[in-house]
């Protein structure tokens, strides 16, 4: 291949690859909470990426209480963000669950499972962590969903 042919090949290849670059616009869902620089979710194409949700209620106050209280608040928060993004739990494909206590694992599974159709659960990672950003957080969950 001559030098000119190599240059032409490189130009054509790079132009083709550049044309395939993902240029989908990003849509940011939700306002930053309590001055933290994070969106509740980001939509791109047919995907929705939901930030980790703690147990804040609609007034921005932590749902103080036992684990079931916090777990239900987190799941309700995620439900609201998914709805705002145009999707729901039936379209969630992946979740990441962070728990601060191993003793909450069974209760987490019980409540978590109630949000899905039996046998149609998303992929999930559950991790036990030493702590979360607020000392009273018992858990945090993030998820990824797709749009119709």
Kindly give the residue locations of the regions a language model identified:
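N-terminal secretory signal peptides that target proteins for export/translocation
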Residues: 1-3
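N-terminal presequence-like segments and the immediate start of the first folded domain
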Residues: 5-76, 80-93, 99-148
């Amino acid at each position: 291949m001559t030098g000119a042919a190599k240059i032409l090949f490189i130009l054509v290849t790079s132009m083709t690859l550049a044309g395939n670059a993902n240029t989908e616009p990003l849509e940011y869902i939700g306002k930053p909470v309590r001055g933290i620089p994070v969106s509740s979710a980001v939509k791109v194409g047919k995907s929705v990426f939901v930030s980790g949700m703690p147990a804040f209620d609609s007034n921005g106050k932590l749902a103080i209480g036992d684990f079931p209280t916090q777990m239900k608040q987190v799941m309700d928060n995620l439900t609201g963000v998914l709805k705002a993004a145009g999707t729901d739990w039936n379209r969630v494909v992946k979740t990441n669950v962070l728990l601060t206590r191993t003793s909450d694992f069974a209760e987490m599974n019980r409540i978590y499972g109630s949000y899905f159709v039996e046998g149609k659960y998303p992929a999930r990672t559950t991790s036990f962590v030493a702590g979360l950003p607020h000392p009273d957080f018992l858990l945090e969950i993030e998820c990824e969903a797709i749009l119709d």
